[in-house]
Curated annotation (Swiss-Prot):
The species this protein was found in: Arabidopsis thaliana (Mouse-ear cress)
Key words, A-Z: Apoplast, Disulfide bond, Glycoprotein, Manganese, Metal-binding, Secreted, Signal
SUPFAM superfamilies the UniProt entry points to: RmlC-like cupins
Feature type site, description Probable non-functional manganese-binding site: Q119
Superkingdom as given in the UniProt entry: Eukaryota
Name of this chain's protein: Putative germin-like protein subfamily 1 member 2
Compartments where located: Secreted, Extracellular space, Apoplast
One GO molecular-function entry: manganese ion binding
Entry GO terms, CC: apoplast
Disulfide-linked positions: C34-C50
Family: Belongs to the germin family.
Residue ranges annotated for the Cupin type-1 domain, each copy included: 64-215
Length: 229
């Protein structure tokens, strides 16, 4: 009996020690709030300077405008209105952000990655084809669904994902991410529109393409910015 108790105690201690090494992508707040400020005379924490708590107002936690449709008159036929720490400074250290996604018929957010956050989306209007691809550990498996109003889909952190309007009307969705600043890496923009450009000969070999095709694609991606506001 004594040996069993010692074993259980040792196991609990190991679990507690292991939990201290768990890494959070957005650290937990160390105070009630830590509103972002561009000032340089404050203590630097969690990636942003903190505003003097005595100067914080309700507006630091407020944004108005997600009811306004985004402009989908672009090459992709889509628009993302991000509401992250840059628009709501009170999100600093809270580990969340939200966005409105608008899609014209046939519009899409092409394959991209959020390097610092998992994501969940809720379709409000229209029809969306969404999905993500697993890593090489799981043989690049595609997980995809057709979503309709009221449907929800989750995307793991750091995996390639996409969203496309496969319906005949405009589509609208709300996306929530687990970071105040999740970042976005559109695969096409990063590979073919980097600054400076990657040597087209390297990309031609990597993607088994003619080098002239690579140069053409680079011209397309380097001349147009991504549609995230």
């Amino acid at each position: 009996m004594k040996g069993l108790v010692q074993f259980l105690v040792a196991k609990i201690i190991l679990l507690v020690l292991a939990s201290t090494f768990v890494h959070c992508y957005d650290p937990n707040p160390l105070q009630d709030y830590c509103v972002a400020t561009n000032g340089t005379n404050r203590v630097f924490v969690n990636g942003k300077f903190c505003k003097d708590p005595k100067l914080v107002t309700a507006n630091d936690f407020f944004y108005s405008g997600l009811n306004i449709p985004g402009n989908t008159s672009n090459r992709l036929g889509a628009s993302v209105t991000d509401v992250d720490v840059r628009r709501i400074p009170g999100l600093n250290t809270l580990g969340i952000a939200i966005a409105r996604l608008d899609f014209a018929p046939g519009g899409q957010l092409p394959p991209h990655i959020h390097p610092r956050a998992s994501q969940i989306i809720l379709v409000l209007k229209g029809q969306l084809s969404v999905g993500f691809v697993s890593s090489n550990d799981y043989n690049y498996t595609l997980f995809s669904k057709i979503l309709y109003p009221g449907d929800v889909f989750a995307f793991p952190i750091g995996l390639v994902q996409f969203h496309a309007n496969t319906g005949k009307t405009h589509a609208v969705a709300i996306g929530v991410v687990g970071s105040q600043d999740p970042g976005v890496i559109p695969i096409g923009d990063a590979v073919f529109g980097s600054n400076p450009l990657i040597d087209p000969k390297l990309l031609a070999k990597a993607f088994a393409l003619d080098v002239n095709i690579v140069r053409h694609v680079q011209r397309v991606f380097s001349s147009e910015g991504y549609i995230v506001k």
